[in-house]
A protein has these predicted regions:
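N-terminal alpha-helical "arm" segments
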Residues: 1-45
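Glycine-rich, often proline-containing surface loops adjacent to acidic residues and nearby aromatics
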Residues: 17-21, 110-128, 204-214
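Internal, hydrophobic cores of structured domains that mediate oligomerization or house catalytic pockets
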Residues: 83-186
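N-terminal low-complexity, intrinsically disordered segments
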Residues: 30-110
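Aromatic/basic-lined ligand-recognition segments
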Residues: 157-233
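Hydrophobic, Leu/Ile/Phe/Ala-enriched alpha-helical segments that form helix-helix packing faces
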Residues: 38-50, 141-149, 229-233
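A short, structural micro-pattern
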Residues: 16-18, 62, 75-77, 112-115, ...
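Conserved aromatic-histidine-acidic binding/catalytic patches
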Residues: 26, 30, 126-134, 217-224
Length: 233
């Protein structure tokens, strides 16, 4: 019998334009790469970066090819890319609801059991970037992080909770900015208890101040609706 979930109408964790964060999951502890190595790899993918912080527990970078204009000071300032130290996972990475919406990783349970450590990475002060510019920065940031952390086996993207294996990211045929939709946007499927109705929605596009979608329907193959959602996005 399928598990029944109750929607939390008080949840405000998904905020348009909010932080984009990811979790890099790995089986063993992995020390943060050295400052020079991180600058070299990030520069390879993102262009010139300034490293303004590199300590045991975190590192911070400013990608110079991406600038947010602040009208009050008439200044163009790069956003911030942050990486935390590797830590032991002390509670489930995905709750039951998130796990029910993993569609692109058949061995998700195996990876969740194997990966006992994680690294958090996020952007900050990036909401002022144009949607395409921010998406471009973020997908390249993901590529750089996978090179910096070769033991990473899977990635969880927030706030959509999209779960992808390392291989599916590296082997994805789309190498353009549009892969943001594959990485960071989760199209979810629900059947509504006590009815023949179904719902498909997306979560993740609001990070770029772009609209997410919701379909409420019955009598239609949900796979067709999911396909339509990705095409519309």
């Amino acid at each position: 019998m399928s598990q029944v979930f109750q929607q939390d109408l008080t949840d405000t964790s998904v905020r348009p334009g909010g932080l984009f964060f990811i979790e890099l999951l790995m089986a063993e502890h992995f020390d943060m790469p050295g400052r020079d190595t991180m600058v070299e790899v990030l520069t390879k993918y993102l262009g010139p970066v300034d490293c303004f912080d590199h300590r045991r527990d975190s590192a911070g970078f400013a990608p110079q090819n991406y600038k947010v204009h602040y009208e009050d000071t008439d200044a163009d300032i790069p956003p911030t890319l942050m990486v935390t130290n590797c830590e032991k996972i002390d509670k489930p990475v995905l709750d039951d609801f998130d796990r029910s919406q993993v569609w692109d990783c058949p061995n998700v349970d195996e990876l969740l059991a194997e990966c006992q450590y994680r690294v958090f990475a996020t952007d900050m002060l990036a909401s002022g970037l144009a949607a395409k510019e921010r998406a471009d920065m973020l997908v390249k940031y993901v590529d750089a992080l996978l090179e910096l952390y070769p033991s990473c086996k899977a990635v969880v993207f927030g706030p959509s909770r999209k779960f992808l294996s390392r291989e599916s990211i590296e082997n994805h045929p789309d190498k353009e900015v549009t892969r943001f939709m594959y990485y960071a946007v989760n199209v979810r499927y629900f059947s509504i208890q006590g009815t023949n109705d179904m719902m498909v929605d997306s979560v993740g596009m609001s990070t770029l101040f772009l609209p997410d979608l919701q379909y409420h329907f019955h009598g239609v193959d949900p796979n067709h609706v999911v396909f339509h959602a990705y095409n519309v996005l």
